[in-house]
Structure formats: C-alpha cells, structure tokens
A protein has these predicted regions:
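Metal-dependent amide/peptide-bond hydrolase catalytic core
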Residues: 19, 201-463, 469, 475-476
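Solvent-exposed, acidic/flexible segments
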Residues: 27-35, 46-57, 81, 136-139, ...
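Sec-exported extracytoplasmic/periplasmic mature domains
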Residues: 39-47, 61-70, 148-155, 188-189, ...
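Solvent-exposed loop/turn segments at secondary-structure junctions
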Residues: 47-49, 81, 94, 107-111, ...
C-alpha cells in the first residue's frame, strides 16, 4: 500500500473541514457483523511465509453464503492450496449493457513478529478506541468493509445498474503468486470491468480528530530493480590495483546521486499540485506554482524537492538500496554489486530506464542488469511502456463527491499518484482505469501499516463500512 503523501501533511496547515462522524447511519446489526468479519480476517494469519490467503477467502465466502449469495457466484481460484483467490459476483439489473465495476482487495499481510508487538498481531484486540492486529490498516479493514457492504445490499434486495465484482487476492505484499496478476492471466473472464476501485488507497487524513483531505490514487509509478556490477581480476590486498571493483562501483553510484531524473508532470500529478497550491501555506504554494510553470522554475523545483515525497511526485527516482563486494578481508574484490531500485513515472518502460542508468554511469566496464520478481537477472528489461494515467472519470468522482459530502462536508478530493506500489498496477497494465479509494480516516501521525502494534480507530472503521456501502450504491444507481 502507498504511504501517506506529503499533500496530507501540507493540508494540516490549512483548515480542517469536518469532525470524523461516528457512522450514525450504520445499523447496529451491521456494526456487529462488520466487527465479526474484521475480527475473523485479522485472526487468520495470511503472511506469505506460513499463513494462508485461502483461509481468509474461505471465511469471506462462508459469510457471503450465509447471506444468500449463490455458490456459483463465489469462485475460488489460484495457483496452490495456500494462495486461492476469491471472486464474488453481485448481479446487477437483468439485461444491463453496462460493464461491471471491479473491486480488488488483497488479503495477505506483511510479516509480523509477536516479540515486537505489545499485543499478539493475530489476536483482534479492542482497547483505548482502537482495533489492534496485523492488517487493521493494510488492508483487511477495506476487505471487511466491502464484504459487509455486499451482505447489507443483498439483505436490502438492492439491484445495482450493473454487476459488481469483488476479487480478494493473494501476495500484494510479497510472495510469488500475486492474485490480481494471476487472475488476469488465468481467469480474465472474471476480471472484466469498465473501471476498478481499489480500497487499498488512502482514506481521509485527519489532524486533531478532523479530516483534512481525501487522496484518490489515480495512477502509479512502476517498480524496477537493477543490478549494477563491477568486475576485475582481483588479487592480494598487499598489492592494490588502480581498478578496484568497489571503487568503480562507488564512482558510478556517486554519479547516480548527482544526476536526478528530469521533472515530468502528468494529468494526475499536475491536478494534485494545482489542488495543493490552493490550500497550502504561501511559501509552499509559491514553490508549487513555480513547478507548474512551463518550463518549470528551477529554483522552485529545488525548493519543493527538498521533501523526499514531494520530489518523488515530480520525477522517476532511482536509489542504491543494497551493496555487496569482496570475499575476504585480505583479498582485492573481484566483483562488487549494488541493487538500484527505481520507481518509474507512467509512460516510461523499465528498459528505457535501464538504458538511462547506463548513460548516467557512463562506464563500459560496468553491467546494468534487470532483476525480475523471482530474483533472476537479464541483460535487458521489459520494454513495454507503462500506460499513461487514466482519465478522471465522472462515473467514479461524481458519486465520490456525493458520498464524501454526506460524511465529510467540505473535504477536498485530490487525485494523486502512488509513489509506492499497489495491485492497481496490474489492472492498469490490463487497460482497466483504476482508482485507489480508502474510507478509513487515519490521523496524520497515526500511520502504523507494516509496523508494530498496527491499529485502526474503532469509529474510523465503522465509518469506513458506511462509506463503502454508500459509495457502492452511488456508483451503481
């Protein structure tokens, strides 16, 4: 999941617009059921190493079966026993010619060591106004939101104007069996849609108990690792050579440090910055306005780029993340390697970026290889350009404005570009416009996803359930 963006912090300096509601419209039976589903999801270990995504999907399937969903509309599919994905079909109006809406939600979680936590990460604990447990923020809350909303809509005999598909999937956080990718490749008929909603997006950001903004993740950078290698004959350390592999590697990395990629705005990042300029303090707004100029003002770029997250909004970033060299303390290194991790702007390929790195290093003795997800390397990278950002569809944003206006009056909705990664990258590569939209409001200082004692505010969770119920109805009227 994407980390909290600089925009959220900037908005704190503006005016908070609404108290977080306590979901007064959420019926008591739905509060009880949502908590029950959430608890069951949290207490089911779905780590890659020793957990089971299948077990979480079976728990969801059982809840939906009890609610009256047909077995044929609850499809388990995946590459192995632990990595079965669940695809749920909520049928729309008979004869509707509208394409389905696809909702994707990963049910795997990052590893959690019990010794690091003050509570058991796989025991659902409520204390001091929070729910604790691995996945409470990322993203079993969103999974529970949508499952409970499906059940509530079914109980109300609601008929949407089109089919709604929910895919609960494996291995977003890691592992070799990413569920969204697997379904798109092996069961594409289940993943047809006009657009995709991914609840793995950020929910409303809060400051002092009041919401400040809702970021809608409308495009993503592409992830890529490259292995930079320097080699030479090596030798005994008592006879140093001028062409030391470690030195050559470090010279190349210093060039990388000194050579940022060019600034490049797309329709989403430009919209995000335009919104920021209207609501941030004057100094920040002035820097943003300079960045938005054609051509951008170099002084403004330098000022705005001082914040790492702001910098990542403007350009492709590549950074050294791992080093390895030498085999013994008294031997010259015959080889030295570095991993360079890149987050690539939409519209550029991994191979284009690899070639750019080769140009930056400008040393024919070095090799720059692409590192695939399984750790294997190749001399070239995939050369398919990532798709440009999708349009900001009124079919997505108008219902969103309607619902947020009910729950958080006056809260700005700001399209944003994910600088991390989510499963939306797979659906966007498949040509499906995808939008990350979360419903759980989290304090700007309260982000614990992937960390110890992960937690989510109790009322933030219940309000998120209500948000998705209202949003699904607004999307399909």
């Amino acid at each position: 999941m994407n980390v909290c963006r600089v925009i959220a912090a900037a908005l704190v300096c503006g005016t908070a617009v609404a108290q977080v509601p306590t979901a007064p419209q959420l019926p008591e039976q739905d509060r009880v059921l949502a908590r029950q589903i959430f608890k069951e999801f949290i207490e089911t270990n779905s780590e890659d190493s020793d957990g089971s995504v299948t077990a979480v999907c079976l728990a969801a399937r059982n809840q939906l079966l009890k609610a009256g969903f047909a077995t044929a509309d609850l499809i388990l599919a995946g590459p192995n026993d632990r990595k079965q994905n669940l695809v749920v079909r909520y049928h729309g109006a008979p004869g509707s010619k509208l394409k389905p809406i696809l909702i994707i939600g990963h049910v795997d979680v990052v590893e959690a060591r019990k010794a690091d936590w003050t509570t058991d990460p796989y025991t659902f604990v409520e204390k001091d106004g929070y729910f604790y447990g691995r996945g409470t923020q990322d993203m079993k809350d969103g999974d529970a939101d949508v499952v409970e909303s499906f059940i509530r809509l079914k109980r109300e005999d609601y008929v949407p104007n089109r089919d709604i598909t929910l895919a609960l999937t494996a291995d977003e956080e890691g592992g070799k069996s990413n569920g969204v990718s697997w379904l798109l490749k092996n069961r594409p008929e289940l993943m047809q849609a006009e657009f995709v909603i991914n609840p793995d997006g950020e929910g409303p950001t809060m400051h002092d108990g009041k919401v400040t903004s809702l970021l809608v993740e409308a495009t993503e950078k592409t992830y890529a690792d490259y292995r930079l290698t320097a080699t030479n004959p090596g030798g005994h350390s008592s006879e140093p050579r001028p062409d030391n592999a470690i030195y050559e590697l470090m010279h190349a990395l210093l060039k990388l440090e000194a050579t940022p990629f060019p600034v490049e705005l797309n329709n989403v990042s430009r919209s995000e910055l335009e919104a920021m300029a209207k609501i941030t303090p004057p100094a920040t707004a002035a820097a943003i306005e300079g960045v938005l100029k054609t051509p951008p003002d170099p002084t403004a770029i330098a000022a705005f780029s001082k914040d790492p997250e702001a910098n990542a909004t403007l350009r492709t970033t590549c950074v050294a993340t791992m080093l390895q060299g030498g085999r013994a303390p008294n031997a010259l290194p015959a080889e030295a390697t570095a991993n360079v991790n890149c987050r690539i702007l939409p519209g550029h390929s991994q191979e284009e970026t690899r070639k750019t790195l080769v140009g930056i290093f400008d040393d024919p003795k070095l090799t720059v290889e692409y590192v695939a997800d399984d750790g294997t390397t190749s001399p070239t990278a995939p050369n398919r350009e990532s798709l440009p950002p999708p349009p900001l569809l009124p079919a997505v944003f108008e219902p969103l404005k309607q619902v947020t206006g009910q729950l958080w009056p006056g809260m700005p909705i700001i399209p944003s570009m994910v600088i991390g990664a989510s499963d939306s990258i797979y659906t966007m590569q498949a040509g499906l416009p995808s939008y990350g939209i979360g419903g759980a409001a989290i304090e700007d200082t309260g982000n614990r996803m992937h960390g110890r004692d992960e937690r989510l505010g109790v009322e933030s969770f219940y309000n998120s359930v209500e948000f998705f119920y209202l949003y699904l109805k607004a999307l399909t009227k």
